[in-house]
């Protein structure tokens, strides 16, 4: 699961056609925030902007939706298997064979 700056980068690259995204939808927590210390020592965290991709998609509350959804399974984790990596490598192999996006 990813969020914040990783969503901004991934969503931005996906929106301009420079990345294919595999896995699960990200957290949808992509607002840049500031941390202000209050007089009593507490810290107030507040958003000061929004992130919108090149195609106009707002990531906050939505997340980056993968081009290829790969379910996350506990048994794969316990077995040391990474189905997301397998899917990405399979796509790369297909691209190399055909020289076009599968």
Whereabouts are the PLM-identified features?
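Conserved acidic, small-residue-rich alpha-beta core segments centered on
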Residues: 1-91
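Conserved functional hotspot residues or short segments at active or partner-binding sites
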Residues: 91-102
């Amino acid at each position: 699961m990813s969020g914040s700056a990783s969503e901004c980068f991934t969503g931005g690259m996906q929106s301009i056609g420079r990345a294919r995204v595999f896995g699960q939808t990200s957290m949808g927590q992509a607002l840049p925030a500031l941390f202000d210390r209050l007089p009593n020592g507490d810290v107030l965290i507040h958003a000061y902007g929004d992130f919108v991709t090149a195609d106009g998609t707002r990531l906050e509350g939505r997340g980056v939706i993968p081009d290829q959804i790969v379910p996350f399974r506990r048994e794969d984790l316990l077995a040391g298997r990474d189905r997301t990596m397998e899917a990405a490598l399979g796509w790369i192999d297909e691209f190399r064979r055909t020289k076009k996006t599968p």
